[in-house]
Structures are given as C-alpha cells and as structure tokens.
Amino acid sequence: MIHIETSEYHWNGPIQNLPGFDKKYKNIVDYILTITDEIWEQKDISLIYDTYDENIIIHHGAAITKGVQTVIDGTIKMLASFPDRKMHGEAVIWSADERGHFYSSHRIASTATNKGDTAFGKATGKQIFFRTIADCAIANNEIYEEWLVRDNLAIVEQLGFDPVEMAKRNRDYSGKKSLAYGVRPRQLNGHQSQYDQSKDEELILSLFLHAWKARSEEERCRHYAPDSIIHAIQNKDHTAAANASFVLSLLNSFPDAVITVERLTSNKGKNRTEVAARWLLTGTHGGSGFFAGASGVPVMAIGISHFIIKGGLITEEWTILDAFDVLCQIHADTGGDIPLTESEMSVE
C-alpha cells in the first residue's frame, strides 16, 4: 500500500500543536532541525535518550537495527571519526495524522573532515561532502521508527578507499543472500492515514511506476522541466537526460527489478510543491550497468527522493540510495571482517 499525506509547509511557520512534545519546539520542522543541531553540532548525546524511543527501529540498507543504544553508539563513533561535521538541513517535508503522530523526511547536506579512524581504516585527514535523507515516524517527542539513506558510496570514495574491496570486508550480510526477499518486514508501523493524491503526487507515482518500469529515457524526461537539475549519488548533478541514462544504467544491473513506492509526503507552497517519496528496489544482480559483473545475488535498496514541482513538472530532484550497501549485499559471502551496522555508517 502506498501511504500519501499532504500538509501545508511549515519552516519558520506558526506554532503547531505537538501533543506530548517538549514545549520549546515551535512545530515539527523546528523539532527535527533543533534536535539535529543539538545532537550533532552541539554534541549533546544525552538528548538522544529524550528524543528517540527506547526500542526504535532503524532501517538502513538491507539491515534493521533496534534500540536507542544503537543510535548513541553510532553517533559517538561518527563524531569520533568526523568531529568537525557540519549538517545543513536542506529541507524537511512532513505530515501528521489524527493521532498526533508525525512523519518527516529530512534532507541533510554534510561537510566533515576525517580526523579519526573509521571502520575502513586509519584517519585520512580528507574533507568530504555527502547527503543523507532520514524519514522519521515521531510521537510524544520521540522518534520511534527511522528509514535512513546515506550516500555512503560517496563517503568511501572521497576517503580514498576502493568501494568493492571495502564491501567485500563487510561481515553483516555473510550467509544472508536471501536477505532481500522476505527477511525484512515491509509493514509501516502506525502510518494509517491515506489521502487522495493530487496531480503533483500523481506525477511522482507515474515517474516511478511507469517511466522507471518502462525503462524509457524519453518517458522519464517527460516528467521534468527542460532546465531541471537532479542531484544524484556520488555528489553528481545531472540534467534530466543524463539522469535518465543513469537510472537506466542502475536498472540494467537488475533485469528483474521491481520498484515499490512505499510512501509519498507533500508540502504545498505558493508557487511550488515539495514531495518526498520513499521507494524500494528489489531484484537479482544479473546485468551490466552501474553494478557491473552479474552475481545472481538478490538485492534490495531503499531510496528516498525529494522533488520540487512547478507548473506540473519536476524542476529539481534529490535522490539518495545507499549504493555501497548494495555492493555489500553483492559481495556478502567473501569473508568480511567489518561490522558496518555497528559502526559510524549506521547513523545520519
């Protein structure tokens, strides 16, 4: 089922009713931006206990981790590896339901210097830039479920490591080649509100369910304004035509790929609509394309995309999927020694 919710956009907007939340938060966007700043920029790790559910479920890559201690451990390790990390909140697209539960999709651009050791090796001293999109389900001042997608391929490459060799060292998926099919629960916890989609949501559904399915560059380009720009993984910016070629290359790596749109959330402004789409790719690594060298391994990848729509066409897009995690799945049984789901790679 695709869950679609539409809300007016609050950035520095009016005070919002937040049942069960700390009174210092003006609205749900303020909540997301404030706790991100206080935890990461001000390094107030203790705030995690107040803003994350004790039994939080976190989806990242093909893995699921549980418990607030996982968040704390990963945050401490990330800050040790990148102590000067700066996180710029580019957008928060949100919605709410009648129970007082909120859903947010937070796009973050980060700069950081690798001053401490990482799971991959010794500190490199290199400066990096990467994007993350975190979808959160929130109630009573606590995030209780999170879908985290970070451009880890960009991080590994900028640090100077070989992504394939590093993927072979990941031990988390060893012996779990069936992980992509059936192990991972796909039910959304608590998100029951569903609204009739507007033309803007229909445009995004059409992009994924028709243009991607047809694997047609021409059909995909019809959804975009002529001067549109797409911010893709590996810190690459594409035109609509160039991005259509990239998507085709991605899909060619999985000839039987199935794309499922799990959730759409939109915020309407005066002259534009911002839409967040969380989607799932499942398929067998069996072609050429972006992930060359067919292995026959079943793979899954969570993707999150943000769109700006004006005049019925996409003018700007940000799409993140963890291509490094896909490499880890492809090379799952190569005798890895790095526990990435327990490392700094498992948090925002």
What are these regions, as identified by a protein language model?
Residues 1-348:
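C-terminal and inter-domain tail/linker signature
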